[in-house]
């Protein structure tokens, strides 16, 4: 796992110029507690998450968290069902590592959606480099949904 994390961090740095001086902590959470952990009060301190899941019915797509990064503790949370050999799971880890790199480099954006956009764009690019012809299908998201998840919306008022 350490070798994968280090190689992904090197790839992120080469792709973005973002420097990662220290890898994040990685924690595995039991499936029964994974969604609860993401939605907990502590996690509301700016978690960034990989959410879509193509294995769920459309109504549940947006509620299935695949992984998340908690900025306050510099921790990537993954479900205990995460598999090192599964390319889709690896790409979830990469997505969350992008959020870690963004945090360490204090990436400034107009809205949180821009952080997600960069993470998804890099996740898709990485999957394409791994030979995945249809990366959106593999991660269970279409381009329109990604646009909606990453849009900067005006504040209510």
Locate each region found by the language model:
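Auxiliary, metal-adjacent structural segments of Zn-dependent hydrolase domains
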Residues: 1-76, 82-83, 130-132
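Short pre-active-site segment immediately N-terminal to the catalytic Zn-binding motif
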Residues: 77-93
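Surface-exposed, polar/charged faces of alpha-helical domains
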Residues: 103-110, 132
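Post-HExxH zinc-binding segment in Zn-dependent metallohydrolases
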Residues: 112-145
């Amino acid at each position: 796992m350490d070798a994968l994390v280090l190689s992904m961090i090197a790839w992120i740095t080469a792709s973005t110029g973002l420097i990662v001086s220290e890898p994040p902590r990685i924690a595995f959470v039991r499936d029964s507690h994974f969604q609860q952990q993401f939605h907990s009060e502590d996690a509301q301190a700016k978690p960034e998450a990989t959410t879509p899941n193509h294995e769920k019915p459309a109504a549940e797509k947006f509620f299935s968290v695949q992984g998340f990064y908690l900025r306050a503790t510099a921790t990537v949370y993954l479900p205990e069902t995460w598999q090192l050999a599964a390319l889709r799971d690896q790409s979830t880890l990469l997505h969350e590592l992008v959020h870690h790199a963004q945090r360490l480099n204090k990436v400034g954006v107009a809205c949180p959606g821009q952080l997600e956009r960069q993470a998804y764009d890099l996740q898709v690019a990485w999957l394409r480099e791994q030979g995945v012809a249809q990366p959106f299908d593999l991660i269970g998201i279409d381009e329109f949904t990604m646009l909606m998840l990453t849009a900067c919306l005006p504040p209510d008022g």
